[in-house]
UniProtKB/Swiss-Prot annotation:
Biased segments, Low complexity type: 1049-1063, 1085-1100
GO cellular component, one term: cytoplasm
Domain notes: CETN2-binding regions contains a conserved Trp residue in their C-terminal ends, which seems critical for interaction with CETN2.
Function per UniProt: Plays a role in the dynamic structure of centrosome-associated contractile fibers via its interaction with CETN2.
Assembly information from the UniProt record: Interacts with CETN2 (via C-terminus).
Name the record gives this protein: Protein SFI1 homolog
Family in the record: Belongs to the SFI1 family.
Renumbered residue ranges of the record's region Interaction with CETN2: 104-123, 468-487, 634-653
GO molecular function ontology, one term from the record: phosphatase binding
Gene name of the record: SFI1
Compositional bias annotation for Basic residues: 997-1006
Subcellular location: Cytoplasm, Cytoskeleton, Microtubule organizing center, Centrosome, Centriole
Length: 1235
């Protein structure tokens, strides 16, 4: 939907611009002269195309030429007609005018006619050029407006998503709070019910104790065990609210205590029994609470100890690793400084040698370039003289120039190949010595590393044994506590996950409903807007067609009259002398044909010989190079295999030993864990059996007690319970019926009703308890005294038990701390020894890595030097080809102009005759007297308009970075006609071009073909034979400049939209894009892995990796980037921590610089866009119209949006300057360190 809407919007704006252009020509009923067929082909509007199709031809000559000039016979026939018409015209002038000199009249008429035609052409050319610029700027502005619109919509969408997420999080938090409140209320009710039940159980036990005094103590113990079992079962529910329960119990206990003290002061005798009963109940609860708190405190202490020990161990390990890394970095920096001092002399020597070679090569190239330039200047001068002397030998001179230029380019290429071969031979002579030195150094380093590694493994085994012992001792104490805590946490998390899943489902359903409703509203509004816009566009098109039809009808009537007068005058001159001119032309054509065929055959034979020699020499050179590369690759592979085999054997032995040690440790750990689990299971079984027995006994006693109590209380309780059950059943039935109908929001009201019911039941229970209180008081008088004594003894025992446990805990903590200190001292000594060994091993390994990296850097610099030479040669070749093509284009333009002048002479013959006749009659009347009235002259035919267009200047303007580069300018039909004539007159050049386009191009490296990623619009390719390549950054810097790429057909760009409604262009001689032939030196591989990389490159241009533009801005070629490391094969010792850190840092710096460059380019493009929009507004305000107000308002809105975007980008650049400065300082520091 979005892509279709954008295409439709672009078409609408383009049609509005075309209406504006057409309204300037048809304003106020004044009809200007229509455009010719060549100018109308450039405008891609449906209205102008319909007008051009309906225009009649001016004369039979134009119609005849338009139908026959596409073939060779048609051109010959046209030439014959021109010659015959010219001869008849001269004879008729002599016969009619007599003593009047026609040369003077013709000279006067030609001057007037040329001045008039030039003024009209200048005016129309200026209008067309100005309107074309406005159209291109409008297209560019509209494209940037669409980009900005899409970005703003995306921004708003992201903000809306963020706001929705915030709302959802708030709703989830609110829902969680509400659920917690409801759960807490239900939990309070549950606690109240539980307390009442416990109170009833205590009363039953007291009654039983009074009846049977011997069983009283046993029953109390059973009840205590039952309470403990129930508390253990409900521990998971009470865990998260323990603190709140503690505070609540303490406050209740304090209030009750104050209340008892007050009652004592008032009535001592009446409150004594009640106070004893209150004390008994609260002391039981308090003792149980103290027991639970003591257990929790012990668990928390154990968990804190375990946490402290684990945190200490983790922080100590982290500190040790950081210290080791710091020591390794210090050693690495010292080694780097030493190696830099050692390699300074080598580097200076290599730089000096490389500089001398470059100077010699540059001097030789400059001399060759000067000689070639002199020869080319002399050749061009001679060619200009020959063109002035005679036009007959023009084609032969062009052929000779092309062949000589081809020979010079071939010699230049083979000279570059020979130089590269000599340089490679010199490098190969020095390679064996370097390889031998590197092998000796690697072997010595490997021996040292192996010795140190053996010592390190022995120490490491001893450390592992000690660590295994310490870990086993540590696990014996902490494993059971950790297991219990993990079990509780797991249960709690399961409940939490279930609640979260329900909440997420509810929020997801609500979100889907809201999004669907919003999307439906937006689609309906979008459809209505599109229908309204289509209706407006159709109405405007109908009005435009009506105006164009009226103007065309008037113009056609006038031209029809002019055509009839011209045909009557030209029919007499055409048919009389046709046979004579044809005979003369046939004799001259036969001689020209014979000369042309001889020249073509000689040129073809010479070119074939040159191609055979060049191909044979190039084949031999490639064969020699391939053999040398294969030998070097075999030697490198053999050396790499030997080194890998040795390293693999050492690594396998080390891994085997490590595996055996780890297996022994794992077996011991598993054995120890099994023993611990078995002991824990045994204890758990014993405890569970004891608890089950106690539960059975308590259940039997409680059952007997209930039977005795229920028999007494059941009569009164049945009536109250039956009434209560009846009310509850009614309320429950009403509640379940309402729950099916109402939503989740009705839960609160239901909860309030349920709370009222619970309050009523609690009030009834309190009434029952008051009735039983009198009976309890009498029972508690005798049991309370005995229970006090027993309670005091229990308190003393508990205090003694606490003191003993505290003393044991202190002794254990002291012993553990002493052992831990001893282990810590031993570990520190072992770590210091390992750090020293690792430091020495890292030092040797870094030396090895530095040597390999240095070799890699040297090889990379050599490759860069070779690529620079190939670039220079390629640039010279491109300049030569551009000069030759420019000359060919100038010659073709000259020939086309001559043909156009001849056509204009034939077409203006009748108008010239009328003018001369008028002058003669006026002169006769003045000399001889007025004999009669002069005949009215026929209307002068409108002169043909010719537009000239220089593609080279357009290409240069496109390369300079104008704002109009984004659109594809169509090629003028005049240029196509000139190129067609050139191809017809030069069959040899046409055959060479077809062979050049059909020939398969050799493989080229990816850095010469891939365009750089940038924010500027890409430049379209220029098609045709006579078009020169764009001069600009692509000639001087082909590595990093933007390569011209053809526009994708299915892309919704303005070029594709503008070419849709207009007529199709006439295809030129070369239909495909013109590929550049690169020299063979640019196809040399960059290293040993070049063939594999070249074969692995994708075939399509979309999947090719693009070179980042930040590489072009790097001032120092000695600083390597991470892409350079990844492009070549990695050595055996490049995987070190220092190099990885350096690569990561350089990648981050590169990303920051790329982001800064992209923002800067976006700011430039927005500024250009704003300037183009301001110019367009100024030009439109100079010539205002009624239809331009809407377009001007839209453009003003777009200009405001672009200015806001410019302000935002400027602020971003201002904020990014400080981090970019830090990145540049870091790069300079790295450069100094590497130097």
């Amino acid at each position: 939907m979005s892509s279709r809407w954008l295409n439709f919007h672009e078409k609408m704006i383009k049609q509005r611009m075309e209406k504006k252009v057409d309204s300037r020509y048809f304003r106020d009923g004044a009809v200007k002269k229509p455009y010719s067929a060549k100018t109308l082909s450039n405008k891609k509007s449906s209205a102008s195309f319909g007008i051009r199709r309906e225009l009649p031809s001016t004369s039979h000559l134009v119609q005849y030429r338009g139908t026959h000039t596409c073939t060779r016979q048609g051109r010959l026939r046209e030439l014959r007609i021109r010659c015959v018409a010219r001869k008849f015209l001269y004879l008729w002038i002599r016969m009619t005018f007599g003593r009047v000199f026609p040369s003077k009249a013709r000279f006067y008429y030609e001057q007037r006619l040329l001045r008039k035609v030039f003024e009209e052409w200048k005016e129309e050319w200026w209008v067309f050029h100005h309107e074309w610029k406005l159209c291109v700027r409008a297209d560019c502005h509209y494209r940037y407006y669409l980009y900005n619109l899409m970005f703003q919509t995306w921004k708003t969408y992201v903000r809306q998503q963020q706001e929705m997420r915030n709302k959802y999080t708030r709703a989830e938090v609110h829902d969680a709070k509400q659920k917690m409140r409801q759960a807490w209320k239900s939990w309070l009710i549950y606690v109240v019910v539980r307390r009442t039940k416990l109170q009833m159980q205590t009363t039953a036990l007291e009654f039983r104790q009074r009846s049977i005094l011997r069983v009283w103590w046993s029953m109390w113990r059973q009840q205590l065990g039952q309470v403990r079992v129930s508390r253990a079962l409900h521990a998971s529910a009470v865990k998260h609210r323990a603190l709140s329960l503690q505070l609540q119990a303490w406050s209740q206990w304090r209030e009750q205590l104050l209340y008892v003290q007050k009652e004592k002061q008032k009535v001592v005798s009446a409150v004594k029994h009640h106070r004893h009963w209150q004390k008994q109940r609260f002391l039981k609860a308090w003792l149980e609470y103290l027991q639970v708190r003591r257990v929790k405190r012990q668990q928390n202490e154990m968990a804190e100890r375990f946490h402290h020990v684990s945190v200490l161990q983790i922080h100590f390990c982290d500190w040790q690793q950081a210290w080791e890394q710091r020591q390794s970095l210090y050693a690495y920096h010292a080694q780097v400084e030493k190696l830099a001092r050692k390699m300074a002399l080598r580097r200076t020597f290599t730089h000096w040698k490389h500089y001398m070679l470059l100077c010699a090569e540059e001097a030789a190239q400059c001399e060759m370039a000067e000689e070639h330039h002199r020869h080319s200047q002399l050749y061009f001068c001679f060619r200009a003289l020959k063109d002035n002397v005679t036009h007959a030998h023009l084609q032969q001179i062009r052929r000779n120039l092309a062949h000589r230029q081809h020979g010079v380019t071939l010699l230049h290429r083979f000279w570059n190949l020979w130089q590269s071969q000599i340089e490679e031979k010199k490098e190969r002579e020095q390679l064996p010595l370097l390889h031998a030195a590197w092998d000796h150094y690697r072997i010595a380093l490997l021996c040292k590393c192996i010795k140190l590694w053996l010592q390190y493994t022995q120490k490491r085994r001893y450390k592992q044994r000690l660590q295994a012992r310490a870990d086993g001792h540590f696990q014996q104490r902490t494993l059971p506590a950790a297991f219990h805590t993990w079990k509780r946490l797991w249960r709690w998390r399961q409940q939490d996950n279930v609640l979260n899943a329900r909440a997420t489902r509810f929020h997801r359903e609500t979100l889907e409903k809201q999004v669907f409703s919003i999307w439906r509203q937006k689609t309906f509004q979008h459809q209505e807007n599109r229908l309204a816009e289509r209706m407006a566009i159709l109405h405007a098109e109908r009005q435009l067609l009506h105006r164009s039809w009226f103007t065309w009808h008037q113009q056609a009537a006038a031209r029809h009259q002019e055509q009839e007068w011209q045909t009557a005058a030209c029919a007499h001159h055409r048919h009389g002398r046709l046979k004579k001119a044809f005979c003369l032309w046939r004799e001259s054509a036969q001689g020209l044909r014979a000369e042309r065929t001889g020249r073509v055959r000689a040129a073809e034979f010479h070119v074939a010989q040159l191609l055979r020699r060049a191909w044979s020499q190039w084949r031999e050179c490639l064969a020699v190079r391939g053999a040398e590369r294969r030998k070097l690759m075999r030697a490198d592979r053999h050396h790499q295999q030997r080194v890998r085999h040795r390293a693999l054997q050492a690594w396998v032995t080390y891994q085997g030993r490590v595996r055996s040690i780890l297996q022994e440790v794992a077996a011991r750990e598993s054995q120890h864990n099994r023993q611990l689990l078995r002991g824990a299971l045994r204890r758990w079984k014993e405890n569970t059996m004891a608890r089950v027995d106690e539960a059975k006994k308590t259940f039997q006693a409680s059952a007997h007690y209930r039977r005795t109590i229920c028999s007494k209380v059941l009569v009164q309780w049945r009536e109250a319970v039956s009434v209560q059950i009846y009310y509850r059943q009614q309320e429950d039935s009403a509640f379940w019926e309402a729950r099916k109908v109402l939503d989740r929001g009705c839960l609160r009201t239901w909860f309030q009703r349920w709370r009222d019911c619970s309050r009523r039941s609690a009030q009834q229970r309190l009434q029952l308890e008051r009735a039983v209180q009198h009976h309890r008081r009498q029972l508690l008088l005798e049991g309370l005294a005995r229970w006090k004594m027993h309670h005091l003894e229990c308190v003393r025992k508990r205090l003694l038990h606490r003191q003993s446990t505290q003393l044991l805990a202190q002794r254990l903590s002291r012993t553990c701390f002493r052992q831990w200190r001893q282990q810590l001292a031993a570990r520190r000594q072992e770590q210091q020894a390992t750090v020293r060994a690792l430091w020495f091993w890292a030092f040797s390994l870094q030396a090895k890595v530095w040597a390999t990296w240095l070799a890699f850097v040297l090889e990379r610099r050599r490759k860069k030097a070779r690529l620079q030479r190939a670039l220079q040669a390629y640039q010279g070749q491109l300049l030569q080809e551009g000069a030759t093509r420019l000359l060919r284009f100038a010659a073709s333009m000259k020939a086309s102009r001559q043909q156009l002048q001849a056509q204009q002479q034939v077409q203006a013959a009748h108008s010239l005759h009328r003018a001369v006749h008028r002058c003669a009659t006026l002169w006769k009347q003045k000399v001889l007297g007025r004999g009669g009235k002069p005949q009215p002259l026929a209307a002068v035919a409108p002169s043909r308009k010719v537009t000239f267009e220089d593609p080279l200047l357009n290409c240069i303007a496109a390369g300079a970075g104008d704002a109009t580069v984004g659109t594809k300018r169509p090629q003028a039909p005049l240029l196509q006609g000139a190129l067609g004539c050139l191809a017809a007159e030069e069959p040899h050049a046409r055959e060479l071009n077809t062979a050049h386009s059909a020939r398969k191009q050799p493989r080229r490296p990816h850095f010469l073909l891939e365009p750089a990623r940038s924010q500027r619009p890409q430049k379209p390719k220029e098609h045709g034979l006579g078009m020169a390549q764009p001069a600009g950054p692509s000639l001087t810097r082909p590595f990093l400049a933007e390569a011209p790429t053809a526009q994708v057909p299915h892309s919704p760009g303005p070029g594709a939209l503008s070419s849709a409604p207009g007529p199709k262009q006439i295809p030129t001689a070369s239909t495909g894009p013109e590929l550049l032939l690169l020299p063979p030196s640019s196809f040399m591989p960059c290293g040993a892995a070049a063939p594999a990389r070249a074969s692995a490159q994708p075939a399509t241009p979309r999947d090719k990796p693009q070179v980042p533009p930040s590489l072009a801005s790097v001032p120092d070629p000695h600083l390597l980037l991470p892409g350079d490391f990844s492009a070549t094969r990695a050595g055996p010792g490049l995987s070190t921590t220092g190099s990885l850190d350096l690569e990561a840092e350089l990648e981050g710096i590169q990303q920051q610089l790329l982001h800064y460059q992209t923002t800067k380019q976006n700011l430039w493009s927005c500024q250009r866009q704003a300037s183009s929009l301001r110019r367009w507004l100024e030009l439109s305000r100079e010539e205002p119209g009624p239809e331009d107000q809407e377009v001007e308002q839209q453009v003003q809105k777009e200009l405001q949006e672009v200015e806001l975007q410019i302000q935002q980008l400027a602020e971003e650049l201002q904020a990014q300057r400080q981090p970019i400065g830090t990145c540049i300082a870091r790069i300079q520091a790295l450069r100094q360190a590497l130097r």
